[in-house]
């Protein structure tokens, strides 16, 4: 299912660049109507009744079909404490779940950005730890479970005025990214890993330079 695959693969540390390109090309060829994957995803959103918004976040990233994204965001905002769920995840959630919060924030509005500042600040240290652990492990492609380019966009989009709060953490993240990482054992995804690491380093460098 191409659209579902795109949702799962957005920024995924275990997908290759070529695979992403192929999926995007296939998705563009599909009809926008009568598509089983799209209809199934839309039904899942419309019928969603879980107590948490967590499993809706996968539909909200910027590479998702806009119709699915809009429907999922609208559903999320019917939950009274949806922003609290996001901030709680940033504070205490597992790193893969933190990834989905930043995927949501990368392109969607929030109502009380001030409530996110401390949770975001705290999450940076955890992201740095995850990146550091991933880079040191030649078998790992995780890169800390977070799309660093998207993360930097989120900081600039929602929290530009709080750059001084985040700067120490981002400097620590930069140091984590500069680790001399051993070559990945997974030769198939080595190029993707190297390109992702380079792009992540550049995103952090650019953020620090533009937020002095």
Model-assigned labels for residue ranges:
Residues 1-212:
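Extended repeat-based scaffolds of very large eukaryotic assembly and lipid-transport proteins
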